[in-house]
Swiss-Prot record:
Assigned protein family: Belongs to the QueA family.
The protein, known as: S-adenosylmethionine:tRNA ribosyltransferase-isomerase
Biological role: Transfers and isomerizes the ribose moiety from AdoMet to the 7-aminomethyl group of 7-deazaguanine (preQ1-tRNA) to give epoxyqueuosine (oQ-tRNA).
Name of a matching Pfam family: Queuosine_synth
EC numbers, comma separated: 2.4.99.17
Keyword Repressor: no
Protein's GO biological process: queuosine biosynthetic process; tRNA wobble guanine modification
Pathway membership: tRNA modification; tRNA-queuosine biosynthesis
Catalysis: reaction(s): 7-aminomethyl-7-carbaguanosine(34) in tRNA + S-adenosyl-L-methionine = epoxyqueuosine(34) in tRNA + adenine + L-methionine + 2 H(+)
SUPFAM superfamilies, per the entry: QueA-like
GO cellular component terms listed in the entry, alphabetical order: cytoplasm
Taxonomic classification: Bacteria, Pseudomonadati, Bacteroidota, Cytophagia, Cytophagales
Subunit structure, as described in the record: Monomer.
PANTHER family in alphabetical order: S-ADENOSYLMETHIONINE:TRNA RIBOSYLTRANSFERASE-ISOMERASE
């Protein structure tokens, strides 16, 4: 398929600037692939679509405050430094994006507020990308504490309002455990302890994996021929305990629901020769677009995505292109909220 086939007009007012007042009360569109029907529910109704022995696969990555603001030495110019990934914990070496990039060259030093933290630019990686070394004597734990203090919740740019204290909590799933994401796995944001408890009482199991979400999901696709698009790599881990419960559910013909595109990408990057989930750890740059034969999950929970985004393409691959086109037209007509803080879709 071609990039232009994933184009649609998204009204600006449907891009959610705040989350729903209560996590589990966002609107939920339920799409049945077998019947082609579309239902309108709220998220807490999700319990009605799952039974004993079904599995929800959740991404337990934890967002860290990746957006820093520093000042360039001598000029004092304000520079945004967005932490992408740690390259060397001992040396405090990081891959970052800087803005404005034209002002930042190798050898420049950046000073971060009253924290006494200083960083030196050691390499150019892309037009906005730099490798920087934080000149810090302490260990990783101490360094993390400083970043937690001076960093800002990395809300996506399409949320055009100042960061609020509530974002620290709301831009994080309640099951976040393993720090390393610079964007939230947003389908998971709708879960509350109450919803999870009710599902567990019903016999639904939650199986964790970790995929540290990078900025790749926000990167625009700029080639019409999708086979030429290259995804950014993201680090993931699937433990044997998760593989075992997922495979048992598959053997018993139960529902295996990927909570979000990140969980789905990790699952599809860990398929054994006999189409079962295997324990795995590493990096994945898997790009899923139609047509695609999904091997593990037979159900998917995902927010409403940007036109021409790799996330929308994955939803189309899973739900079927025609049905998803219809669903998105319906979502716009019914004024569903889109993107990270928006409403959610359950594809069964």
């Amino acid at each position: 398929m071609k990039l232009s086939e994933f184009k649609f007009a998204l009204p600006a007012e449907l891009v959610a600037q705040h989350p729903a007042a209560n996590r589990d009360e966002a609107k939920m569109m339920v799409i049945n692939r077998a019947t082609g029907t579309i239902e309108h529910k709220i998220f807490k109704d999700i319990i009605n679509y799952f039974d004993e022995g079904d599995i929800m696969v959740m991404n337990n990555t934890k967002v860290f405050p990746a957006r820093l603001y520093g000042n360039k030495e001598k000029t004092g110019a304000k520079i945004e430094v967005f932490l992408l990934r740690e390259l060397n914990a001992e040396l405090h070496l990081w891959d970052v994006l800087v803005d404005p990039a034209r002002k930042i060259r190798v050898g420049n030093k950046l000073y971060f507020g009253e924290s006494d933290l200083v960083a030196e630019v050691v390499d150019n990686t892309t037009s906005r990308g730099r490798t920087i070394r934080f000149l810090f004597d302490g260990n990783s734990e101490d360094f993390s504490k400083i970043i937690e203090t001076i960093g800002e919740t990395p809300l996506p740019r399409y949320i055009k309002r100042p960061i609020e204290e509530a974002d620290k909590d709301r831009y994080q799933t309640i099951f976040a455990e393993n720090k390393g994401a610079v964007a939230a796995p947003t389908a998971g944001l709708h879960f509350t302890k109450q919803v999870m408890k009710r599902m567990e009482i019903k016999g639904v199991n939650f199986a964790p994996l970790t995929l540290h979400v990078g900025l790749g999901s926000f990167r625009t696709v700029d080639v019409e021929d999708l086979t030429k698009h290259k995804m950014d790599s993201e680090n993931f881990i699937i433990e044997s305990t998760t593989a075992d419960v997922v495979n048992k559910a598959l053997d018993n013909k139960k529902r295996v629901c990927a909570i979000g595109t990140t969980s789905m990408r990790a699952l599809e990057s860990s398929v054994s020769a006999n189409n079962r989930l295997k324990q795995n750890a590493g990096w994945t740059d898997r790009f899923i677009f139609p047509p695609y034969d999904f091997k593990i999950a037979n159900c998917m929970l995902t927010n409403f995505h940007m036109p021409e985004s790799t996330l929308y393409m994955m939803a189309c691959a899973f739900g079927g292109y025609e049905l998803m086109t219809k669903a998105y037209k319906t979502a716009i007509k019914e004024k569903y909220n889109f993107l990270s803080y928006g409403d959610v879709m359950l594809i069964i």
